[in-house]
UniProtKB/Swiss-Prot annotation:
Cross-link (Glycyl lysine isopeptide (Lys-Gly) (interchain with G-Cter in ubiquitin)): K154
Keyword Chaperone assigned: yes
Domain notes for this protein: A long alpha helix in the N-terminus mediates dimerization, while the earmuff domain is responsible for core histone and dsDNA binding. The C-terminal acidic domain mediates the inhibition of histone acetyltransferases and is required for the DNA replication stimulatory activity.
Quaternary context: Headphone-shaped homodimer. Isoforms 1 and 2 interact directly with each other and with ANP32A within the tripartite INHAT (inhibitor of acetyltransferases) complex. Isoform 1 and isoform 2 interact also with histones. Isoform 2 is a component of the SET complex, composed of at least ANP32A, APEX1, HMGB2, NME1, SET and TREX1, but not NME2 or TREX2. Within this complex, directly interacts with ANP32A, NME1, HMGB2 and TREX1; the interaction with ANP32A is enhanced after cleavage. Interacts with APBB1, CHTOP, SETBP1, SGO1. (Microbial infection) Interacts with herpes simplex virus 1 VP22.
Compartments in which it is found: Cytoplasm, Cytosol; Endoplasmic reticulum; Nucleus, Nucleoplasm
Organism: Homo sapiens
Region: Dimerization, residue numbers: 31-78
Record protein name field: Protein SET
Tissues where this protein is expressed: Widely expressed. Low levels in quiescent cells during serum starvation, contact inhibition or differentiation. Highly expressed in Wilms' tumor.
Post-translational modifications: Some glutamate residues are glycylated by TTLL8. This modification occurs exclusively on glutamate residues and results in a glycine chain on the gamma-carboxyl group. N-terminus of isoform 1 is methylated by METTL11A/NTM1. Mainly trimethylated.
Length: 290
């Protein structure tokens, strides 16, 4: 699995916490300390705070340097991303298969979502020139019975106040095909052996801007799927694995049955041999009597 890269949206700075209040016993104990001891403690606390500020300053500097390196390598990766997209275009249903095989994304997909995603031909993730300012995810679709758009996009950025924000393409749904307004229904797909209430449509993600700073689906696509989608496309189908397991069990049972038959046959042959031996002994006894 590809390593997760640092999010382009900068983390909020943590304010230093004040030292915990002293309990009654500690207060009374410290009250008995010489003033010199109190002064040394206060000076130590102030020095610790100064050192911590230096550590925080270096951490911020490191983050800036990491972002610069990431920006440099983003440019170097672009030709390879383009070549990969051209090759992926030769594989039918690559992206819908990748999404269905991803455990977090598949949990968001209903039956009709999967049908719509069969028309998805390309996915592109673009990180902005100033990485800290955000990124955009573009979904390219063939002509389909659900909506008019050829491209659906969602963008994550920092607004004027510096807070995470997002915006997206307005989906132009065809008459009666708005998947975000469908009623909840029960799904039973024998091919994937699941029966549960339909999840909220995947496409509601394009209209949900409630918490852009913690958009799990956007982060999963950008940091987990986009760096190496092939690893999820090649995940073996669980139903196939279960089917193979059942076939193996059947084969084992058949082999055990054949072994039992062979053992019974050997026992029968042994009994017949014993009967033949007894018959021969009887004939010999009769001959001796004569």
């Amino acid at each position: 699995m590809a390593p997760k890269r640092q999010s382009p949206l900068p983390p909020q700075k943590k304010k230093p916490r004040p030292p915990p209040a002293l309990g009654p016993e500690e207060t009374s104990a410290s009250a008995g300390l010489p003033k010199k001891g109190e002064k040394e403690q206060q000076e130590a606390i102030e020095h610790i705070d100064e050192v911590q500020n230096e550590i925080d300053r270096l951490n911020e500097q490191a983050s800036e340097e990491i972002l610069k390196v990431e920006q440099k390598y983003n440019k170097l990766r672009q030709p390879f991303f383009q070549k990969r997209s051209e090759l992926i275009a030769k594989i039918p249903n690559f992206w819908v298969t990748t999404f269905v095989n991803h455990p977090q994304v598949s949990a968001l997909l209903g039956e009709e979502d999967e049908e719509a995603l069969h028309y998805l031909t390309r996915v592109e993730v673009t990180e902005f020139e100033d990485i800290k300012s955000g990124y955009r995810i573009d979904f390219y679709f063939d002509e389909n019975p659900y909506f008019e758009n050829k491209v659906l996009s969602k963008e994550f950025h920092l607004n004027e106040s510096g807070d995470p924000s997002s915006k997206s393409t307005e989906i132009k749904w065809k008459s009666g095909k708005d998947l975000t307004k469908r009623s909840s229904q029960t799904q039973n797909k024998a091919s994937r052996k699941r029966q549960h209430e339909e999840p909220e449509s995947f496409f509601t993600w394009f209209t949900d801007h409630s918490d852009a700073g913690a958009d799990e689906l956007g982060e999963v696509i950008k940091d987990d799927i986009w760096p190496n989608p092939l690893q999820y496309y090649l995940v073996p189908d669980m139903d196939d694995e279960e089917g193979e397991g059942e076939e193996d069990d059947d084969d084992d049972e058949e082999e055990e049955g054949l072994e039992d038959i062979d053992e019974e046959g050997d026992e029968d042959e042994g009994e017949e041999d014993e009967d033949d031996d007894e018959g021969e002994e009887g004939e010999e006894d009769e001959g001796e009597d004569d």
